[in-house]
């Protein structure tokens, strides 16, 4: 039986019924097939175990992953307070799921445990037969600063260039952890991974962000954990004031909008930048971001515009579809993971971004997505299936999933 997917959405006020209604619609969408895996993106305001119970009241005891979100996508629609459930079935692919808790104690070790949990689970399903592993999706609670350490632990086991993507989930602000669960085991200090494998499974991925360099690059001279203290010969505050003007007191104002439009870009390869949104400026001029920063890395002011973000989205979906188009394969589904900060810039154009993606795929292709405050994704504009992933802010990641034609 080929890979099939059914999707459904629930947006009831009551969490139990939101989950239940999403499950009823997803089962109807799936048809006669029996689901083997459920993946639910559930807004952080819903109690996750109530969502679990509502879904399982309809599905029974199937493998179910639930991830808190800032907002969800189904088809061509952005919906904030909702549950979007995807049900997968078929024997033409394999999946493995693993959950780790106490993530903040040692994210690097947690990454190792998560990766080995996925590999052990897959080995048990395939009876140790060698199967091509294609993609890992990983979601972690925003309970820790060392986001890159979680990724490093995963990469040391799975391979630095193995496709790893996902997000960090928080509630109303970054470093305010939201919840995730696997089969009613839930955590606000954990990570869940989903491994997709199969010799006939074809997955294309793309990623980008759309913020463009504005200011001159400066070297990070002094940094401690997630605090940037010195950029060459000046504080981060002075660097910002140099471009935005001295009339804005960034230490006393709510800088959310300013930080979203004008984030910092960290250079990880020549002329390739990942985005970091400032959380706030300290009285001494230091800047706080949501993940650890290394010294001697170049940083520069970036700028986001609607046009540039939408162009990045179009490039991202085109890149994701390339491997499938080369083999004349219709994607069964497309999954999108994106920074909720994109909505701050795009506003009502957030649906334009979604429609750019929807228009690129056939009507039969399901489109689902989750908005988070941090993303794991390859660099913009690189060979996506062989490029290492990085922890980023504001990114858009897309995976297109299909099955080889018989």
Predicted regions and their residues:
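Small-residue-enriched flexible segments
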Residues: 1-58, 62-347, 351-360, 365, ...
């Amino acid at each position: 039986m080929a890979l099939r997917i059914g999707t459904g959405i629930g947006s009831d006020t009551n969490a139990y019924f939101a989950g239940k209604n999403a499950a009823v619609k997803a089962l109807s969408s799936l048809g006669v097939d029996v689901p083997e895996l459920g993946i639910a993106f559930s807004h952080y305001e819903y109690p996750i175990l109530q969502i679990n119970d509502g879904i399982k009241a309809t599905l029974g005891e199937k493998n179910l992953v639930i991830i808190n979100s800032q907002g969800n996508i189904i088809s061509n629609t952005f919906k904030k307070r909702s549950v979007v459930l995807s049900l997968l079935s078929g024997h033409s692919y394999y999946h493995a799921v693993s959950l780790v808790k106490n993530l903040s104690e040692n994210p690097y070790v947690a990454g190792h445990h998560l990766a080995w949990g996925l590999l052990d689970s897959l080995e048990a399903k395939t009876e140790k037969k060698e199967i091509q592993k294609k993609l890992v999706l990983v979601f972690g609670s925003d309970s820790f600063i060392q986001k890159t350490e979680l990724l490093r632990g995963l990469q040391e086991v799975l391979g630095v260039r193995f496709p790893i993507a996902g997000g960090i989930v928080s509630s109303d602000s970054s470093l305010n952890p939201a919840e995730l669960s696997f089969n009613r085991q839930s955590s606000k200090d954990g990570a869940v991974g989903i491994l997709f494998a199969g010799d006939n499974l074809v997955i294309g991925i793309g990623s980008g962000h759309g913020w463009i360099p504005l200011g001159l690059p400066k070297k990070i001279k002094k940094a401690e954990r997630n605090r940037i203290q010195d950029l060459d010969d000046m504080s981060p505050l002075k660097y910002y004031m140099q471009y935005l003007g001295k009339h804005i007191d960034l230490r006393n104002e709510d800088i959310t909008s300013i930080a979203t439009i004008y984030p910092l870009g960290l250079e990880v390869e020549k002329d390739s930048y990942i985005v970091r949104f400032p959380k706030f400026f300290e009285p001494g001029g230091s800047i706080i971001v949501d993940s650890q920063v290394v010294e001697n890395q170049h940083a520069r002011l970036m700028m986001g515009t609607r046009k540039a973000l939408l162009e990045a989205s179009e490039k991202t979906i085109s890149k994701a579809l390339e491997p499938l188009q080369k083999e004349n394969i219709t994607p069964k589904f497309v999954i999108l993971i994106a920074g909720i900060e994109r909505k701050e810039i795009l506003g009502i154009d957030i649906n334009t971004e979604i429609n750019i993606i929807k228009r690129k795929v056939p009507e039969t292709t399901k489109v689902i997505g989750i908005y988070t405050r941090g993303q794991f994704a390859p660099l913009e504009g690189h060979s996506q299936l062989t490029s290492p992933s990085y922890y980023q802010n504001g990114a858009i990641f897309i995976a297109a999933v299909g099955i080889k034609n018989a």
